[in-house]
């Protein structure tokens, strides 16, 4: 229902050529050694026909990996080859298993453009690729706050004071295997300059000199495989800030966060703002507001941070994420009004970290413990049994994310699905049609403002919840409209299959759809419901029974 669902959708709808097994165990068994996961579920139940590859150095038992249906072991070690040969000699491993895996590897090779002699080019259209990156990043950026129509920037706003280290070293993406060697990375400062804004040169040089000096103190080799340390914000005296407030039209502050493999994020000075960031935010907003100037905060982050304690200070907040090589240009497009923001939050921003249901079971182990993970590729894990370090209990049950916040009526800073626009939208004329496969829902979305824009329409379903434990409502479909001119409308149609209404019956090991009155809820976020319509399923539906696998090996006390 929760953790396998996304993978199932990808496998069934996209039919990928390869699937990678992960490092972790599920209920006591490494994923790369789990026949239940890689064969019973992935192949027998979902019909997957492609190749499965391990993550680098994943798992411990090469023979078990081959038997489980892990076709390619990466990067490949001599001891793995030796153990497979020995298992073939003793009969522990059958040649049929090896042949099956080899066949899948060869089938992948036969499908590749290289094998088919595709005449690849050494001259890709890099400008076109950059244009796609710029557009995609802007589409996903989210306007969290916009008091007094601060954004888009007015025509008389030209001179800007830009504060924050990452304004000048914009974070393009995370660390580890997710990192890429981009050809260039456009900073916020460069993006704003390219859009015709004038940035304070003295402040820019002050930051560049400071960042250069601080980077020289870092032993970068130590952080080859983990997230590098955050550079503390430089100290700015109030006299300097006041001069900038007098000389410029407004201020921008960038808050940056980086993350990647080998270490999890932390609460203090990561989820929460650091003391130096709070000081910068307090000083800049107070002094610029005293001068009647506005302040915009740009969040150059890859995950959730705490916002409730400080979001009342700036006039506008843009969640820019980590926008790739064109990130600074993408932000400038939104700030200038060239692009109307249309992104929506894919997660909830809680008031406090402790408000999240998963907070009691999250492995907050710190960087030193994380460094051991890299060594354990070669030595194997220590074999201890420490909760939230060596294993984690997923005790939220089905109440993951917004489902938990809704069920227990927990106040949030920004709800799931939230995102503002420079214009406004109304929803009307809800309809639904029963089809052979499920339901087709539709509603009309109209741009009621004065600026062209897009809206992400979200469809939540509230189940009867009489015979099965169900969330208050769940997102079942969503779509983004085209660019709607002022006054223009679009009919949005969303399809929800009957199987999407099903829950997993643990006792019967099958999917089931309960009968009764359902509610279709059209919303602009999980807590901004615009339209409601009811429909009735008169007869319960029991789906095909599935294999009883991946059962928990520890006692779980799930939320209900």
Question: Language-model features: where?
Answer:
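Short beta-strand elements
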Residues: 528-544
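Glycoside hydrolase catalytic-domain context in secreted enzymes
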Residues: 1-506, 510-522, 526, 548-560
């Amino acid at each position: 229902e929760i953790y396998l669902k996304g993978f199932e959708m990808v496998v069934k709808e996209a039919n990928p050529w390869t699937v990678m097994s992960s490092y972790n165990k599920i209920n006591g068994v490494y994923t790369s050694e789990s026949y239940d996961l890689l064969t019973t579920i992935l192949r027998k139940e979902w019909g997957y026909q492609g190749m499965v590859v391990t993550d680098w150095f994943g798992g411990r038992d090469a023979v078990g990996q081959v038997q489980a249906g892990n076709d390619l072991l990466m990067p490949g070690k001599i001891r793995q080859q030796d153990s497979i040969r020995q298992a073939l000699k003793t009969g522990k491993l059958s040649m049929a298993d090896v042949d099956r895996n080899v066949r899948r590897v060869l089938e992948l090779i036969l499908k590749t453009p290289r094998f088919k002699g595709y005449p690849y080019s050494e001259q890709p259209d890099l400008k076109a690729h950059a244009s796609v990156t710029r557009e995609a990043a802007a589409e996903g950026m989210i306007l969290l706050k916009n008091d007094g129509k601060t954004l888009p920037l007015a025509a008389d706003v030209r001179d800007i004071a830009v504060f924050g280290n990452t304004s000048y070293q914009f974070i393009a993406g995370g660390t580890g295997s997710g990192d890429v060697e981009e050809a260039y990375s456009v900073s916020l400062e460069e993006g704003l300059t390219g859009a015709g804004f004038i940035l304070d040169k003295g402040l820019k040089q002050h930051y560049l000199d400071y960042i250069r000096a601080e980077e020289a103190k870092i032993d970068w080799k130590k952080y080859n495989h983990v997230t590098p340390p955050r550079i503390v914000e430089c100290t700015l005296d109030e006299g300097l800030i006041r001069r900038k407030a007098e000389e410029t039209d407004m201020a921008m502050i960038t808050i940056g966060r980086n993350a990647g493999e080998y270490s999890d994020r932390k609460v203090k000075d990561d989820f929460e703002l650091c003391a130096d960031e709070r000081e910068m935010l307090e000083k800049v907003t107070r002094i610029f507001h005293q001068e009647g100037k506005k302040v915009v905060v740009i969040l150059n982050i890859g995950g959730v941070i705490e916002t409730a304690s400080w979001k009342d200070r700036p006039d506008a907040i843009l969640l820019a994420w980590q926008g790739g090589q064109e990130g600074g240009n993408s932000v400038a497009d939104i700030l200038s009004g060239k692009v109307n923001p249309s992104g929506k939050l894919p997660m909830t921003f809680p008031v406090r970290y402790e408000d999240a249901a998963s907070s009691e079971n999250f492995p907050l182990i710190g960087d030193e413990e994380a460094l051991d993970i890299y060594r354990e590729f070669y030595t194997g894990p220590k074999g201890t049994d420490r909760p939230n370090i060596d294993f984690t209990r997923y005790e939220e049950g089905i109440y993951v994310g917004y489902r938990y916040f809704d069920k227990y009526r927990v106040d949030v800073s920004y709800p799931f699905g939230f995102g503002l626009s420079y214009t406004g939208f109304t929803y009307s004329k809800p309809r639904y049609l029963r089809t052979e496969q499920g339901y087709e829902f539709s509603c009309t979305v109209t741009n009621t403002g004065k600026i062209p824009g897009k809206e992400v329409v979200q469809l939540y379903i509230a189940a009867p919840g009489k015979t099965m434990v169900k969330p208050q409502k769940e997102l079942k479909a969503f779509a983004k409209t085209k660019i709607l001119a002022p006054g223009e409308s679009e009919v949005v149609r969303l399809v929800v299959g009957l199987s999407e209404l099903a829950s997993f019956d643990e006792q019967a090991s099958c999917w089931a759809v309960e009968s009764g009155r359902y509610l279709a809820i059209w919303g602009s976020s999980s807590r901004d419901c615009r339209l409601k319509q009811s429909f009735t399923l008169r007869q319960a539906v029991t789906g095909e029974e599935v294999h009883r696998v991946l059962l928990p090996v520890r006692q779980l006390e799930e939320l209900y």
